[in-house]
Amino acid sequence: TDLTGNYLFKHTIERLRPCSDPDFSVHVRLLVNHCSGGYSFISNHAANHFGMALFFYISFRNVLGRWVWTAILWAAAIAYAQVYVGVHYPIDVLAGAVWGSLIGITTGRLFNKHIGFAIFDK
């Protein structure tokens, strides 16, 4: 998710972060020590965490049971925090969550098809 987020989206779209945008930064309440460099769209934090969460959901829900939802709640909290601290617009984290979810679902299905729970058989 991280590489595709950077090279397919960030370096193609080149959207400034809310805290870096000269027209918008006066409206941002930045809650971190500095505004990160780089571009904003998509949020790789959201993509990475939703990718992992959906991979775990697809691959391990039978093993982890209801605990698998903890990963999805964690991903949602990370995504919300990116907007809350002022380094992403809401659409950045929404797009990151969707992109990460698609990758997580795809890799989870591939994992189940080719490896599955054979790793637990001993």
List the model feature ranges, each with a label.
Residues 29-122:
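Membrane-embedded catalytic cores of phosphoryl/pyrophosphoryl-handling enzymes
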Residues 2-20:
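Transmembrane alpha-helix/helix-exit interface in multi-pass inner-membrane proteins
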Residues 14-33:
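Membrane-interface interhelical connector segments
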